[in-house]
Amino acid sequence: MSLMQFSGLLVVWLLSTLFIATLTWFEFRRVRFNFNVFFSLLFLLTFFFGFPLTSVLVFRFDVGVAPPEILLQALLSAACFYGVYYVTYKTRLRKRVVDVPRKPLFTMNRVETHLTWVILMGIALVSVAIFFMHNGFLLFRLHSYSQIFSSEVSGVALKRFFYFFIPAMLVVYFLRQDSKAWLFFLVSTVAFGLLTYMIVGGTRANIIIAFAIFLFIGIIRGWISLWMLAAAGVLGIVGMFWLALKRYGLNVSGDEAFYTFLYLTRDTFSPWENLALLLQNYHNIDFQGLAPIVRDFYVFIPTWLWPGRPSIVLNSANYFTWEVLNNHSGLAISPTLIGSLVVMGGALFIPLGAIVVGLIIKWFDWLYELGNREPNRYKAAILHSFCFGAIFNMIVLVREGLDSFVSRVVFFLVVFGASLLVAKLLFWLFDSAGLIHKRTTSLPQAQVEGKL
């Protein structure tokens, strides 16, 4: 890459970053937090944060990258996607009407709410315990990270249930919403994340998500300022780098340490070069249509229920890794949100996907506002827990693609909804057995004596 080509890419990168960052800043000033702000920051991080890191790798370490024209296409496709997304998100689909009282879809009481978070926590802890009994601490047993996807590891499907510990702790926080509950959420979820990191053998997702939710709650409540958020972001990058070194068993120093930091940070937070790599191989893609979305559900179907289930799930990430790149190392390479759309339908699917994503984020914000207006604090805690719990699915949406997001959000909705139903059923059984008693508030001693 020549300096002239780099200068052109730099101008496009600066304009695109300024465009998205400005819109995000105005939205932040208006509402402080909503899921549009979160998605915008995540999109900016995924598709634009990596450009400076790539530039240093190219000019400092002479690392090979995609041709400049392909990198330009990646930057422009990301900027255009966001433009279509933002217009869709801001477009009002119907006239604003004065809120009319309507019968709620469901309601919650104190016992049902506590039963819900206990059930969610139980799902996570039981899954971790079973996985541990089968595999032990994989971090100290396996020699490479790719081995966690091999036949040596049993009960891999259980990992999908680990995450429900975070929504459980979110319910606990939203019932109190004070600084002590906020700090308890951080300590409990990060401790659980470190435990799963050691048991699974290097999966950092639970730690990243817990820390991100903690920061956003702090921003909403005014407990964290922007400079504190920036400092926490730097700390998070360093922490994820250290965990990555441990995961891959790397021992580096000097220039090698700097090089490793750059490429691991880029791959962890901003895999934008994967999109460029996909566009570079555009002519090798046999567009898959909506099949990757359907195929991604296969992993949730046990083999005893479907004996003929394909052992290889050809979602967009696996198609990109195996069919386009001919890479069979055992690890799937994330195509990113835009890349998954390209795999499904080429360039035409990029604006269509942006419209779909705009509607998805609009729905989550509607649900979040519903929780903010809800007078029943128990129901509000459940709604907020569901919304913030879905942050992991939004990270999957931007990093992995639309197909992975759809299957995971449906799975999350089913498990969360089933936990609610079980909690309500248990409450009904306990109430029928006469085990539920209304809380009575005792009068102060002085008032009691006065009444006597």
Curated annotation (Swiss-Prot):
Residues annotated as signal peptide: none
Biological process according to GO: enterobacterial common antigen biosynthetic process
Membrane topology category: Multi-pass membrane protein
Domain of life: Bacteria
Main location: membrane
Keyword Cell membrane applies: yes
Pfam families, A to Z: WzyE
Keyword terms: Cell inner membrane, Cell membrane, Membrane, Transmembrane, Transmembrane helix
Pathway involvement of the protein, from the record: Bacterial outer membrane biogenesis; enterobacterial common antigen biosynthesis
Job description of the protein: Probably involved in the polymerization of enterobacterial common antigen (ECA) trisaccharide repeat units.
Quaternary structure (record): Probably part of a complex composed of WzxE, WzyE and WzzE.
Protein name per its UniProtKB record: Probable ECA polymerase
Lineage: Bacteria, Pseudomonadati, Pseudomonadota, Gammaproteobacteria, Enterobacterales
